[in-house]
Amino acid sequence: MRKDDLCITVPTFFRCPISLDVMKSPVSLCTGVTYDRASIQRWLDGGNNTCPATMQILQNKDFIPNRTLQRLIEIWSDSVRRRTCVESAELAAPTRDEIADAIDRVKIEKEERDDREVLSKIVRFGRESDDNRGFLAGKDDFVKLLVDLINQVDFETTSAAKSLVVQEAVKILSTIRSKVSDRRRFSNLILTNGRDRLSVIVYLFKTGNVELKIDCAGLLEFIAVDAESKLLIAERDGLITELMKSISKDSDLSLIESSLSCLIAISSPKRVKLNLLREKLIGDVTKLLSDSTSSLSVSVTEKCLKLLEILASTKEGRSEICGGDGECLKTVVKKLMKVSTAATEHAVTVLWSVSYLFKEDKALEAVTSVNGVTKILLLLQSNCSPAVRRMLTDLLKVFKVNSRSCLSAYDTKTTHIMPF
């Protein structure tokens, strides 16, 4: 239940001017102001002879019951109680038996009725627990049923109600994907003999709200199981552009994370990498990493660095990473420490790729300009993995060969850890 669901707005004229509570027995004084009987009685019993709201002297202390207002308050109170009961029933997690019946209903009548309400109930059930997600994923032909629902829509001609049904189906597929035992078969259901299903998911990612975008990105990430599926997804019109819009600093943090995960999942084919570079992904990732006004989660930082690591495997990517004034590499150096072990490994791999493996001259200048050598030396003293230690050692060799002066400032304090 959301916080807003707990707030009930009470009409001002239903409140007693003294207690500010909803009046149980409204009565009016000779001044025309209405109070709750108990509150105004206490006021008068206290020796007061004025109207509390107007401070006029009371000509008499007679109470006139306000029957009309009392009836309005009763009607309003009944409606609030009914609405609260309905909302509580809707928000309560359905049982497995109820869900099994709901699934059977969708199977039998999927062509004849609006199943949005039923599917919404299944979404709530799936998001309730890991066991529930496993239960849904294990239901015979349920996944295929949901995929078939997606295949039945054409957003140019389909009714709004049917479109909402498809959205709920996508939410369920995204919710239960981690419990699907055969990921490749799941991917084939969506991608094989039904390219329109992929178009629907991409369309929903482009046009949906934040929650739906996150579900679509997660689903696309999950079905990217091999080079063929990655290419099919990445080359769908407008998807990469939309994913890149979703990683802007102004986007929802969860959407940024899911979009980065999707980009990582589809980026391994070289054709996709080159497409990402043409779309200036490195610039967008650099802006995201270097933005001092936003507090990125550790996970988002790791994913940004992972993307840079992937793109650094191409000549064009390395050129872009080292381009301009070296802002991208400088940002990577700043993320070498104090983020996480995974972030350190990705950042070191980026530096190793451009500086040691492919010996980009601009990389050496950028790294030394932000005291990168100091951080490399400090990392060698840390509890890093053997693979990272080897890359750090290689980096120091490159810096020593290319410019002994960049190490001279650190000789007195760090010579004891020099690996050569």
Curated annotation (Swiss-Prot):
One of its GO terms (biological process) is protein ubiquitination. Its EC number is 2.3.2.27. GO terms for molecular function: ubiquitin protein ligase activity. InterPro entries: ARM-like, ARM-type_fold, PUB22/23/24-like, RING-Ubox_PUB, Ubox_domain, Znf_RING/FYVE/PHD. Keywords: Repeat, Transferase, Ubl conjugation pathway. It comes from the Eukaryota. It catalyses: S-ubiquitinyl-[E2 ubiquitin-conjugating enzyme]-L-cysteine + [acceptor protein]-L-lysine = [E2 ubiquitin-conjugating enzyme]-L-cysteine + N(6)-ubiquitinyl-[acceptor protein]-L-lysine. Residues 9-83 form the U-box domain. SUPFAM superfamilies: ARM repeat, RING/U-box. Pathway: Protein modification; protein ubiquitination. ARM repeats lie at residues 130-178, 184-225, 228-268, 270-313. Functions as an E3 ubiquitin ligase. This is U-box domain-containing protein 27. The lineage of its organism: Eukaryota, Viridiplantae, Streptophyta, Embryophyta, Tracheophyta.
